[in-house]
Amino acid sequence: MIAEQIFIIILVLTVLHTAIERIAKRSLSYSNVNYTYTQSISFLVGYTIVYIIMSHISHAVIISIMIMISYAIYIVIKMRNNQQIQNDIEMFMFGMIAGLGIEIVG
């Protein structure tokens, strides 16, 4: 069970890292290292939060919490039109969704 989850996490992070590198190569306004680093950290934070919460709270509660968080983040994005922040938040949300999916499947 734990080995399966570790394998899935490594697989997801590998795919994510590849995707981020491709996005970073297309993006001319950021250096690849910072872009990849901040995006990966954002993903891990989102994933970890969901993983920790899901072990203590039921699915319905975590889904409603995620909806509230995503709405709050949407408001923040509208207030600050900063591409770097938007990209980091996008990866944070992706991490939360990935964590939720793996928890429900597992």
Curated annotation (Swiss-Prot):
User: What's the domain of life for this entry?
Assistant: Viruses
Which named protein is this?
Uncharacterized 12.1 kDa protein
